[in-house]
């Protein structure tokens, strides 16, 4: 019985396609916002009136957040855009816990006309690591 290359190697071909997709997904999901470090975020907050948008869930936010940050969990960002509409022309620094939440939040903001969207590289973990101020609720 003769078989073709594709039939003999179907498992490896599927594994290669899935692996490639997994490698590309983080790059695609983060492309909506520029990543900035803690020092760059501080400059935007202090000198350009940036809105700090915390997209973590309620429990994570209560454990500690940046002073004067606006809390909108990523799951509710579409429903609550009107709350931040006045900041469309300001930089927005997204605070998150590492994962895909920041990429999703940035995509929603960009699609709705927010052009200066930034993700804090490392999220809240890097902010804490650098001993920056945290407010606890």
Residues covered by each model-derived region:
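Rhodanese-like catalytic fold shared by cysteine-dependent sulfurtransferases
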Residues: 1-44, 50, 58-91, 101-137
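N-terminal glycine-rich beta->alpha transition that marks the start or flank
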Residues: 54
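Short hydrophobic segments within beta-strands
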Residues: 95-97
